[in-house]
Amino acid sequence: MQKMNIGTVLFDQSKGAAVVTLVEEQGERVLPIFIGIWEGMAIFREINRTASPRPVLHDILYNLLQGFQARLEKVVLDAVQESTYYAQLYVTQQDLTMIADARPSDALALALKFQAPIYVTEAVLATGGKRADFAVGEELREEAQAALDTSEDVRAWLENVRPEDFADPQ
């Protein structure tokens, strides 16, 4: 298993989709995962520590787990079938550990909320991981950081976005 960090979240409103990239902490591989736009916004908000106007799923799960004095110890992406990734949540409460199946988008948002480590199995990386050219990766990271530094418009949009904004114009 390889420890991963969340790299970027990219949005394509025309397709109603987002891509979250996981970057190998001690290596050169990147794992892109296609997710829904709402899930992408939840992860983007967690990265930027921007609260949602109303609690979303990972906020509710976080509050419940905290209330039961449980903790998310780690997230493991352990399978991919027909381009669908699978994640496991490792939750502990005292001496008890429970493993729960989760969508990667929810698992990643929870990992950010709990500041829990994210791991990906070698089998999953072998299937979907891409080798990242370090220079290009560093250039993209700098561009992404510059975009985040000037993202007040995006933050304002995220705070005010409504479901109707994505309605079919027909």
Regions found by a protein language model. Give the residues of each.
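Divalent-cation
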Residues: M1-Q170
